[in-house]
Regions:
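Histidine-rich, glycine-flanked metal-binding segment
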Residues: 1-10, 25
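Conserved beta-strand termini and adjacent loop/short-helix elements that scaffold enzyme active sites
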Residues: 2-3, 93, 197-199
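Divalent metal-coordination and catalytic microenvironments
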Residues: 4, 15, 35, 90, ...
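Short, basic, glycine/proline-bearing loop/turn elements
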Residues: 8-16, 198-203
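Histidine-centered catalytic micro-motifs
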Residues: 10-21, 165-171
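Acidic, glycine-rich active-site loops and adjacent beta-strand->loop/helix elements
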Residues: 17-20, 44-47, 171-173, 200-202
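Divalent-metal coordination cores built from histidine and acidic residues
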Residues: 24-132, 225-227
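Histidine/acidic residue-rich metal-binding segments in metalloenzymes
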Residues: 76-77, 110-136, 142-266
Length: 266
C-alpha cells in the first residue's frame, strides 16, 4: 500500500566506488536504503582489464578489505560480482587510466603506435563484454599524462559500440572553461556521446563561470552533439591530497612518488 508515499524507480549512482566494498559485503545497505539500485563504476580506474602490474598493485595497496583477484577482464569482474551475489545492479565504464597503465605504465609519455593499439584492442574487448564506454579522471596521475588526441583515439573505438565518454575533467577550477572545451572536442572528433562527471566550479574566482559552461554545452547540443552532465546534490566536495601535487612528483607510480616525498623540499 503506497498511499501517502512517494514512489520512484530505483536511483542510479553514476559514480560509484563500490568496486571493493561489494566484494566484502554484497548487501550494499548504505546505498540500497537510499533507493540506489544501480552502481556504475569506472571513473578513470576500472577493475579490468588487469595486466600483471595492475593486479599486483591493487593487491599491494589493499586497505581493510582483503580479497583475491581471480579475474582479468572487466567482464570477468562483473561476472564475479554477479555470481557472488549482490543486492544492486552493476555496470561499468572502462577506465582510461586502466587502459593507459596496461599499455604505457605510470610514465609521463605519449603512447607509441603499438601501445595505442593495445589500448584500442582492450576497448574493443571491454565494449564487447558490455562496458558502457570510456571513463576518465584527468585530474589524477597517471591520467593527466594523457593527451586529448589519445583520448579521442580510444573513444573512437567505444563509439563504434554506441558507448559514452564520461569525464572528471582536467580542471574544475581555474581552467574549467578550457576543460569543457576539451571534452566537447573529444565528443566531436570521436563521434561519441559525452557526460561531465559532477559538474562544479571550484574556488570563488571561478564561481562566475557556470553560465559560460552552460552556454558552451547548450551550443554543442544545438549543433548536434549529445552532451550531458551530472551534479552533486550538495555544495561541498572532497578529494585526496594527491590532487594538489604536480604531475612530476607522481610520475612512475606510487613507490617513486613516496620516495620523492622524502625530500624535505617537496
Amino acid at each position: 500500500n503506497a498511499t501517502d508515499r512517494a514512489v520512484s524507480p530505483g536511483f542510479i549512482n553514476m559514480l560509484s566506488w563500490g568496486v571493493e566494498t561489494l566484494i566484502e559485503d554484497g548487501k550494499s545497505q548504505s546505498d540500497i536504503r537510499q533507493g540506489v539500485t544501480l552502481e556504475v563504476f569506472g571513473e578513470g580506474m576500472s577493475w579490468g582489464p588487469l595486466n600483471h602490474e595492475l593486479r599486483e598493485n591493487i593487491l599491494k595497496n589493499q586497505g581493510d578489505i582483503k580479497y583475491d583477484i581471480n579475474w582479468t577482464t572487466l567482464g570477468e569482474y562483473l561476472q564475479f560480482l554477479e555470481e557472488k551475489g549482490i543486492s544492486t545492479n552493476v555496470a561499468s565504464f572502462i577506465g582510461a587510466t586502466t587502459l593507459r597503465i596496461n599499455a604505457v605504465g605510470y610514465e609521463n609519455k605519449k603512447p607509441n603506435d603499438s601501445e595505442l593499439e593495445i589500448m584500442k584492442n582492450l576497448v574493443h574487448q571491454g565494449m564487447k563484454e558490455g562496458a558502457m564506454g570510456i571513463g576518465s579522471s584527468l585530474i589524477y596521475a597517471p591520467a593527466f599524462y594523457s593527451s586529448t588526441e589519445e583520448l579521442v583515439e580510444i573513444c573512437k573505438i567505444a563509439a563504434q559500440y554506441d558507448g559514452m565518454y564520461i569525464s572528471h575533467m582536467r580542471s574544475e577550477g581555474n581552467r574549467l572553461l578550457e576543460s569543457v572545451d576539451e571534452l566537447l572536442t573529444i565528443a566531436n572528433d570521436a563521434g561519441i556521446r559525452a557526460e561531465i562527471y559532477h559538474l562544479k566550479q571550484s574556488g570563488k574566482n571561478n564561481w562566475n563561470k557556470l553560465d559560460r559552461v552552460i552556454q558552451k554545452i547548450d551550443s554543442a547540443r544545438a549543433e548536434g552533439l549529445k552532451i550531458t552532465t551530472d551534479m552533486y546534490t550538495y555544495i561541498a566536495g572532497a578529494t585526496g591530497l594527491d590532487a594538489s601535487m604536480p604531475p612530476w612528483v607522481q610520475e612512475g607510480g606510487l613507490d617513486k612518488w613516496i620516495e620523492r616525498l622524502k625530500n624535505p623540499k617537496i
